[in-house]
UniProtKB/Swiss-Prot annotation:
Family stated for the protein in its record: Belongs to the UPF0178 family.
Source organism, top-level taxon: Bacteria
Record-linked HAMAP family: UPF0178 (MF_00489)
CDD domains: PIN_YqxD-like
Name under which the protein is recorded: UPF0178 protein XOO2722
PANTHER family in alphabetical order: UPF0178 PROTEIN YAII
A matching Pfam family: DUF188
Length: 161
């Protein structure tokens, strides 16, 4: 007997405006291997492989346009790849999982502190104090991201054969 409601399979959303190409490549390979839906959202044109479950959405330019598009579409259980802390907070509120391109998970236990630190750093920059940017992406960052992605994929229910 079939269940009355078949839950929609979880999918992966990517805040692609600032997502490194090497991380996108990891995501493309995972989507090809697993058949998981992958959607990249950016305010510029994106090149994606020709796979039936990979798509790109181009949103109008403007602050937070890609973030808003993801937040409006994300569902509980989905995975969102983003460096944007406010977007990660919105994703967590929706019941989805958020992870940064370095493999760092955003959690309900850490998001408030991360928002606080972000606000403090913005104040410093507003006062003219140089705060620097993130360091270059290293092999260990790519490995940490791939490990987080694999954990999320392994936790997803597989359709019966």
């Amino acid at each position: 007997m079939k269940p009355l409601h078949t839950p929609k399979p979880a999918q992966i959303w990517v805040d692609a405006d600032a997502c490194p190409a090497v991380i996108r490549d990891i995501l493309f390979r995972a989507a090809a291997r697993t058949g998981t839906a992958l959607t990249l959202v950016a305010n510029h044109s994106l090149s994606t492989p020709t796979l039936p479950h990979v798509r790109a959405i181009q949103v109008p330019g403007g602050p937070d346009a890609a973030d808003d598009a993801i937040a409006e579409r994300v569902a509980a259980g989905d995975l969102v790849v983003t460096q944007d802390i406010p977007l990660a907070a919105r994703v967590l509120e929706a019941g989805a999982t958020a992870v940064g391109p370095r493999g760092e998970p955003f959690t309900s236990n850490t998001i408030k502190e991360r928002l606080s630190v972000r606000g403090f750093m913005e104040e410093l920059r507003g006062a003219g104090i140089a705060t620097g940017g993130p360091s270059a992406l290293h092999a260990r960052d790519r490995q940490a991201f791939a490990a987080q992605l694999d954990r999320w994929l392994a936790a997803q229910p597989r359709p019966p054969l």
